[in-house]
């Protein structure tokens, strides 16, 4: 029985608390509504005092907006007529300049990092890549030339080099023999021909 009484008292107490909370919320809501109504009445009085009726104020705002739009259209026409960039073009130009500046700063930062850690710069990589490409192109050209020579029966670069070296050796040998002949004649030694006789 005691338990039943305690639970009923607890329920009754909670009901009273919730009722008082609801009354407090209702009173606060009524006060807020009253304050809002007073504010609206005050605003209406101010508008009436300063001759700014709702319709008149809206009319003025629309006229001001129309004047501003006409001014912007006129400015746009002037820019177009005299070749000046519009606000949008200026914005695009400014954005591209900022992107270029950011890219330059990034490249400078990357260059500093490469320098600090001993990595080659983009320019060095580019030069290295170009030289490798040139070597590859030259090798491909040489291979193509070698195939053509083989196909058409022309001597290859190596064969030409060997032939040229043997011709140079023969020429050097002839020059040496002529020089030796001149020396022998100048100093009175018999030549190889004279020795044979």
Curated annotation (Swiss-Prot):
The modification D-methionine is found at residue 49. Residues 40-62, 88-97, 123-132 have a biased composition (Basic and acidic residues). Keywords: Amidation, Amphibian defense peptide, Cleavage on pair of basic residues, D-amino acid, Endorphin, Opioid peptide, Repeat, Secreted, Signal. It is found in: Secreted. The modification Serine amide is found at residues 86, 121, 156, 191. Residues 1-20 form the signal peptide. Residues 24-197 are annotated as: Disordered. Coiled coil: none annotated. One of its GO terms (cellular component) is extracellular region. Pfam families: FSAP_sig_propep. Its main location: secreted. One of its GO terms (biological process) is neuropeptide signaling pathway. The modification D-alanine (Ala) is found at residues 81, 116, 151, 186. It comes from the Eukaryota. Residues 30-39, 167-176 have a biased composition (Acidic residues). Belongs to the frog skin active peptide (FSAP) family. Dermorphin subfamily. Dermorphin has a very potent opiate-like activity. It has high affinity and selectivity for mu-type opioid receptors. This is Dermorphin-1.
């Amino acid at each position: 029985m005691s338990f039943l009484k305690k639970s009923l008292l607890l329920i009754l107490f909670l009901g009273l608390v919730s009722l008082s909370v609801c009354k407090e919320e209702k009173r606060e809501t009524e006060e807020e509504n009253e304050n809002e109504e007073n504010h609206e009445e005050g605003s209406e009085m101010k508008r009436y005092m300063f001759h700014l009726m709702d319709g008149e104020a809206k009319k003025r705002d629309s006229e001001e907006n129309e004047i501003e739009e006409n001014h912007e259209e006129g400015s746009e026409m002037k820019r177009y007529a005299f070749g000046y960039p519009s606000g949008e073009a200026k914005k695009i130009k400014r954005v591209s300049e900022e992107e270029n500046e950011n890219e330059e700063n990034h490249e400078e930062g990357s260059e500093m990092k490469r320098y600090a850690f001993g990595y080659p710069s983009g320019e060095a990589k580019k030069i290295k890549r170009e030289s490798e490409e040139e070597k590859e192109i030259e090798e491909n050209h040489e291979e193509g030339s070698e195939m053509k020579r083989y196909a058409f029966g022309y001597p290859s670069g190596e064969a030409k080099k060997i032939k040229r070296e043997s011709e140079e050796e023969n020429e050097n040998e002839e020059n040496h023999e002529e020089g030796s002949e001149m020396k022998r004649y100048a100093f009175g030694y018999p030549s190889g021909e004279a020795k044979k006789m």
